[in-house]
Regions:
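Flavin (FAD/FMN)-binding glycine-rich loop and adjacent Rossmann-like elements that form
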Residues: 43, 122, 128-140, 144-455, ...
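Aromatic, loop-rich ligand-recognition surfaces of beta-strand-rich domains
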Residues: 460-462, 466-497, 586-668, 674-718
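Short, well-structured beta-strand segments enriched in hydrophobic/aromatic residues
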Residues: 153, 471-473, 516-551, 696
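Exposed low-complexity, polar/acidic, P/S/T/G-rich flexible segments that act as propeptides
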Residues: 536-586, 702-718
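Beta1/beta-strand and adjacent pyrophosphate-binding region of the FAD-binding site
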Residues: 2-14
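Extracellular carbohydrate recognition and processing domains
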Residues: 498-522, 667-684
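N-terminal Rossmann-fold NAD(P) dinucleotide-binding loop
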Residues: 17
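Conserved N-terminal/central alpha/beta ligand/cofactor-binding core
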Residues: 5, 23, 29-30, 34-112, ...
């Protein structure tokens, strides 16, 4: 037997476990990450190949998940722009194995735990192939297994469906979300025969459910298009996992046989390139934690004093009968971004065990939203920060004082977690009391249209309410017409949940181009205004040559957003001082500095007295309204409402330098080239004493301007 002693043991190597382990190690803890598979990534790995999705995929603008998960996704976009699942595995493995203070145990299945007075002492598992048994002793543990297996073995009560179970209780039959196996297809330049295995379902069995509830197959569907190949929701998704996997294999091979050999498809040259051997599991245990997130919390966006991360995926219900159901293959209720409290990550009676991933504490109606992998990754980062706080102050999570919880939240905010409504209050951040100036500031200008966006099917413009609550926009009409719209107000816009209605506005159009006034309602003050247009055949909205950050247009049914020629009234949207206003993302306002187009825009922080620092944190603009999935196929069905990125975000800073005004004059103290990160940490290499600091944007990935949400300056950051 091999034994390890550590600060934190994380069990489970999916997005939640990987993010938990990386965050904890970044915060200075010694960490052991235990994964029962040969690769990291869980359902997003090359073994299962479900793509990671979250708030943006469900229609929320400016809400792509960042933090630790965001850094991994950005690295994947940089090194693996085609979204190949194998390379996503390596992005995760590279991050984990290169992180100081982090030990990785692959192929190690934890089957035993030791508990004393409800405190975990160790977890133990066998490692495949090495014939080793590992026992890991830790001060804190995070169960990121998905199934909540560590918590269940430790005696933590848990939920399955609507039923609460305690240790050793036999689960009752219940209706759950099923599991799925995916496949990838490939088109060859010659016919490829397919002879089905004997276990595959017959053509007649496969044909029976097709066409019901949106279950339509084609020869081109591939990867996550196959999500509705679903089974197991009426079985025990843990105890019957192997039977479920084989049944899914029968279904998948039967469907492919139907595509190849029924004569209904142009599939002669198509073949299977890959078939999953492991199902992607959607639902099993949910732990009974100090607080259970509810449907009401999701729909009403409850403001929690201990909010630790956020969600934004649909309330996404699937019939338990899966592919055999007569119901729609899913019912998706869109929601706005909502907070999840840290109390969902622990049971008050178990002082050193935390949870992350789909096994956190929620009511089932909330679980169908929190279960997706982007949200799971954020929960892992939050659990790691909570573990760090517990070890720092020597307390259980339930015993933390309000000011200690707030310190954990501020730490998460610094580590690029978006906590809706929370602003930077870090007393160690020297940038907060600096005066800020810049070389320039961007102002949208009136000009000719760079293109046109049809309003035939309606559409929207999302813009934060300016200080002068009005704006101007250009439309073109083929003939005289009436254009009508409804105003909505919200802190963060969504194409599917535009917010509270706040009045109507209409315009009489003449044939040709018309400049129109948009009058923001009083309810929009301090919020976003969403101007939602009724369908207007023959009317188009003018598009701008350059994006005005924080202002977008689009349609409710489409994930592609455009840049309207919309001129807001007097505002401070892109002012230099926004970089120290405490917000590093869009929330009610853009909260960023955007320069005018120029060769080397700069931003300067200046203090009344000299300050000593060694670290500068820059929170950059990676285009937060576009998804960065872990992987994707060359083809995806329209119902996913997914828009693929074409390369790196043009507004992201690529090359940047930092200069300091010391007693000997200006000198460069830090520089980065080829940046791909959203949170860019620059080290001066030594303590620098200066009265001013200047950031110079040398190059972006395409934009002529500089985009910057926030600057932080620290002495001895870590």
């Amino acid at each position: 037997m091999k034994e390890l002693y550590t600060d934190l043991a994380v069990v489970g190597g999916g997005p939640a476990g990987v993010c938990a382990a990386l965050e904890a190690a970044r915060l200075g803890l010694e960490v052991v990450l235990i994964q029962n598979r040969p690769v990291l990534g869980g359902s997003s790995s090359s073994e299962i190949r479900v793509w990671t999705r979250g708030a943006v995929g469900a229609g929320n603008l400016f809400s792509e998940e960042m933090g630790v998960l965001g850094a991994l996704k950005k690295r994947n976009l940089y090194t693996n722009p085609d979204g190949t699942p194998l390379f996503w595995d390596d992005v995760l493995l590279d991050a984990v194995t290169s992180q100081p203070g982090l030990t990785l145990l692959l192929n190690t299945d934890v089957t035993e735990v030791e508990v004393q007075d409800r405190r975990l002492l160790w977890v133990q598992g066998s490692q495949q192939a090495s014939e080793r048994t590992w026992r890991v002793h830790a001060k804190m543990f995070i169960d990121a297994t998905g199934d909540g297996s560590v918590g269940a073995r430790a005696g933590v009560p848990y939920w399955i469906g609507e039923h609460l179970f305690r240790k050793d209780a036999a689960p009752e039959p219940t209706a759950l979300l099923g599991s799925s196996i995916l496949y990838y297809v490939k088109k060859e330049d010659h016919p490829v025969a397919f002879v089905p295995p004997s276990y595959a379902y017959s053509l007649e069995d496969v044909e029976a459910p097709l066409g019901r509830g949106g279950r339509i197959v084609s020869e081109t569907q591939s990867g996550s298009d196959c999500w509705w190949f679903e089974y197991g929701g009426l079985r025990n998704t843990i105890a019957d996992a192997q039977d479920i996997a084989f049944e899914l294999r029968r279904i998948v091979m039967g469907i492919w046989n139907y595509i190849k050999n029924s004569g209904r498809f142009n599939a002669a040259c198509y073949t299977l390139e890959w078939v999953g051997s492991l199902p992607g599991k959607r639902e099993s245990r949910r732990m009974d934690t100090a607080y259970l997130l509810s449907q009401e919390d999701v729909l009403r966006h409850t403001d929690f004093a201990d909010g630790g991360f956020y969600g934004g995926w649909y309330m996404d219900f699937h019939p338990a009968e899966g592919i055999g159901s007569d119901e729609d293959n899913c019912t998706q209720i869109p929601v706005n971004v909502y907070a999840v409290p840290l109390r969902c990550l622990y049971h008050a009676d178990f002082p050193n065990l935390l949870f992350a991933g789909r096994n956190i504490g929620t009511r089932r109606e909330a679980f169908v939203s929190t279960r997706v992998m982007n949200t799971c990754g954020l929960s892992g980062q939050a659990a790691a920060a909570l573990a760090w706080g517990c070890l720092r102050w020597g307390k259980s999570p339930a015993a933390l004082a309000p000011e200690e919880v707030e310190r954990i939240r501020q730490t998460l905010l610094r580590e690029d977690m978006f906590l809706p409504g929370l602003s930077n209050q870090d007393p160690e951040d020297l940038a907060r009391d600096a005066a800020v100036t810049a070389s320039s500031r961007y102002q949208p200008e009136e000009g000719p249209a760079a293109g046109w966006f049809s309003l035939e099917q309606g559409g929207f413009v999302a813009c934060p309410c300016p200080d002068e609550p009005r704006g101007r926009f250009l439309v073109r009409a083929d003939a005289p017409a009436t254009l009508q719209a409804v105003w909505h107000c919200c802190p963060l816009p969504s194409r599917l949940c535009p917010g509270q209605p706040a009045g109507k506005q209409s315009w009489q159009l003449t044939a040709g181009e018309n400049w129109l006034d948009a009058l923001f309602p009083s309810q929009a003050q301090g919020q976003y205004g969403m101007l939602v247009f009724d369908p207007a055949p023959g009317v188009s909205l003018a598009l701008a040559e350059r994006r005005a950050p924080g202002i977008l247009c689009g349609r409710a049914d489409a994930p592609e957003y455009r840049d309207p020629l919309f001129l807001p009234g007097k505002n401070s949207f892109y002012a230099p001082e926004n970089v120290v206003d405490g917000c590093s993302r869009v929330w009610r306002q853009p909260h960023l500095w955007c320069s005018a187009p120029e060769a080397a825009p700069w931003l300067e922080l200046r203090w009344d007295t000299p300050r000593t620092f060694d670290t500068i944190l820059l929170y950059l603009d990676p285009e937060l309204s576009m998804e960065i999935p872990s992987s994707r196929t060359d083809h995806w069905e329209d119902h996913h409402r997914f828009a693929a990125r074409k390369g790196m975000p043009p507004q992201l800073m690529r090359d940047v330098s930092v200069q300091a005004l010391t007693e000997n004059g200006w000198r460069t103290v830090a520089r980065c080239t080829g940046n791909w990160r959203r949170l860019l940490e620059l080290s001066a290499g030594e303590a620098v004493t200066a009265t001013a600091l200047r950031l110079v944007r040398e190059k972006t990935w395409g934009d002529e301007r500089a985009h910057l949400f926030e600057v932080r300056v620290y002495r001895q950051h870590r």
